[in-house]
């Protein structure tokens, strides 16, 4: 224990993990931060081992994946851990973001923390797309072609930008080399952002379910919450390894087990399941340029949350109307994902458009309006000393 507090390197570990003061009332939803750390470590380690055997060449990329699966000792486990780990990484991120929205973790004094988190999320999406292209199956090839071709919608420079990304006039060796290099490099940029995220967290401390200051009631992270995290780790690995060993291809497109062929178009080009909601928003807007803007805006719109939420109350536990619309938003997000997995035909296109409208309306109109309503009710109740707010909160 003395070494933990005297050694300059171990002191950081001690301050951030062992003796870090945490609110005494945080729930298991706060486990997802540490679970994301576990997912990130899994992706880094398995990714390094996969890179040792992968060949970024359009003629050999698919074969090198098969070589990893068939000839490398335990290569299939490493590949399935990396592929399924990406899906679990995003699932944990979505729950982590939902927790932040529900408990108001984006509000002052944690605006910097939230901003870095959104940037991390955006970078994760880019890294995930780059990795999706590398196996160079049918879905990888056509996904790369379609998604990168969206840049052509940018006025004046669009076509030149697409050719610059491809390194040619079509997806070629130059493209897959660039994607592989960036897919290997960007996780280390992501690691730097994660460190910034932890610094921001350490500066103001964790939020808590009540959304109030917990300075008077904090306890050390270890052993009280580290053991709580161990329960989360065990549950996570139980589910994760079930997918890895028993249903490793459940979340994988079957077309990606066919070598990429630029002369044959798949019946449907869809991204990984964790990007489907944003793909739906892209597809729901008929104009190509506006669709691209809408897709990017759907990701970056989380940045405006600290500024549009004007409610005097932080936590949704005490905001019954916000709670109702939050659950509607979650269901709407799942609907967007479901629509993205279906063909662009009626009635899916109409449902996707209405869901996309609600998605943006939630951030731009509903949250500010709810803040005005809640502040008005709060001031009336405080002035008249009536139990109406208490009644509504328990009824809803």
UniProtKB/Swiss-Prot annotation:
Keywords: Electron transport, Heme, Iron, Membrane, Metal-binding, Mitochondrion, Mitochondrion inner membrane, Respiratory chain, Transmembrane, Transmembrane helix, Transport, Ubiquinone. The chain crosses the membrane at residues 32-52, 76-98, 113-133, 179-199, 225-245, 289-309, 321-341, 348-368. A ubiquinone binds at residue 202. It is a multi-pass membrane protein. GO terms for biological process: mitochondrial electron transport, ubiquinol to cytochrome c. Heme b b562 binds at residues 82, 183. Heme b b566 binds at residues 96, 197. Its main location: mitochondrion. The keyword Hydrolase does not apply. Gene3D superfamilies: Cytochrome Bc1 Complex, Chain C (1.20.810.10). The keyword Transcription does not apply. One of its GO terms (cellular component) is mitochondrial inner membrane. Binds 2 heme b groups non-covalently. One of its GO terms (molecular function) is metal ion binding. It comes from the Eukaryota. Coiled coil: none annotated. Its cofactor is heme b. Belongs to the cytochrome b family. Fungal cytochrome b-c1 complex contains 10 subunits; 3 respiratory subunits, 2 core proteins and 5 low-molecular weight proteins. Cytochrome b-c1 complex is a homodimer. Component of the ubiquinol-cytochrome c reductase complex (complex III or cytochrome b-c1 complex) that is part of the mitochondrial respiratory chain. The b-c1 complex mediates electron transfer from ubiquinol to cytochrome c. Contributes to the generation of a proton gradient across the mitochondrial membrane that is then used for ATP synthesis. Heme 1 (or BL or b562) is low-potential and absorbs at about 562 nm, and heme 2 (or BH or b566) is high-potential and absorbs at about 566 nm. This is Cytochrome b.
